[in-house]
């Protein structure tokens, strides 16, 4: 396993649409292991493959609270089968937009279909933080960042803040 570099805005790869995965094999599992290690090291709760420059429809996530046992999750070729009409606001952040947080309104519940770490198809309902996080990460697969849901002014402020933060580092 290896920690990979996380791309930050305005890196052009983050606007790229990720491609479906043909099969879950040892090579893909090695990528997912690297992604998980990278996410934990950041630290974060979710990471899409494109955030480390790999344009594949793969997401890793762990929503365990600090001090709890880790609960890694893997989502290959995830798709939303259904989304609730009711929405919920949630303050989001992103490893590709460091040190910036803002409220985004998303469907409160979704039904997902994806392949897991073993390549088995799973259907699952998501709500709360899980629903927010999976929608946020799935946006990455379409080349969309959470700041793209904000006004142009807020988006520009976020990018400016990230650039300023990068210069200071």
Swiss-Prot record:
Cofactor(s) recorded in Swiss-Prot or TrEMBL: Fe(2+)
Keyword Nucleotide-binding assigned: no
Top-level EC class as recorded in UniProt: hydrolase
SUPFAM superfamilies reported in the protein's UniProt record: Peptide deformylase
Catalytic activity: N-terminal N-formyl-L-methionyl-[peptide] + H2O = N-terminal L-methionyl-[peptide] + formate
Key words, A-Z: Hydrolase, Iron, Metal-binding, Protein biosynthesis
Cofactor: how bound: Binds 1 Fe(2+) ion.
Active-site residues from the entry: 137
Biological process annotations from GO: co-translational protein modification; translation
Disulfide bonds: none
Enzyme nomenclature, EC number: 3.5.1.88
Lineage top rank: taxon: Bacteria
InterPro entries the UniProt entry points to: Peptide_deformylase (IPR023635), Peptide_deformylase_sf (IPR036821)
Record bears the keyword Nucleotide-binding: no
Annotated binding of Fe cation, by residue: 94, 136, 140
Pfam families listed in its UniProt record: Pep_deformylase
GO terms assigned for molecular function: metal ion binding; peptide deformylase activity
Family recorded in the similarity comment: Belongs to the polypeptide deformylase family.
Described purpose of this protein according to its UniProt entry: Removes the formyl group from the N-terminal Met of newly synthesized proteins. Requires at least a dipeptide for an efficient rate of reaction. N-terminal L-methionine is a prerequisite for activity but the enzyme has broad specificity at other positions.
Protein name, entry field: Peptide deformylase
Organism per entry: Phenylobacterium zucineum (strain HLK1)
Organism placement in taxonomy: Bacteria, Pseudomonadati, Pseudomonadota, Alphaproteobacteria, Caulobacterales
């Amino acid at each position: 396993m290896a920690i990979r570099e996380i791309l930050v805005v305005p890196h052009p790869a983050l606007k790229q649409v990720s491609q479906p995965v043909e099969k879950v094999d040892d090579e893909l599992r090695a990528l997912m292991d690297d992604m998980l290690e990278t996410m934990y090291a950041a630290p974060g709760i979710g990471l899409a493959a494109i955030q480390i420059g790999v344009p594949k429809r793969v997401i890793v996530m762990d929503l365990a609270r600090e001090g709890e046992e880790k609960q890694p999750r893997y989502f290959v070729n995830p798709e939303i089968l259904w989304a609730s009409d009711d929405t919920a606001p949630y303050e989001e952040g992103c490893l590709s937009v460091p040190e910036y947080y803002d409220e985004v309104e998303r469907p409160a519940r979704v039904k997902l279909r994806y392949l897991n770490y073993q390549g088995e198809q799973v259907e699952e309902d998501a709500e709360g933080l899980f629903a927010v996080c999976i929608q946020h990460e799935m946006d990455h697969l379409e080349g969309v960042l959470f700041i793209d849901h904000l006004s142009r002014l807020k988006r520009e402020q976020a990018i400016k803040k990230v650039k300023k933060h990068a210069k200071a580092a």
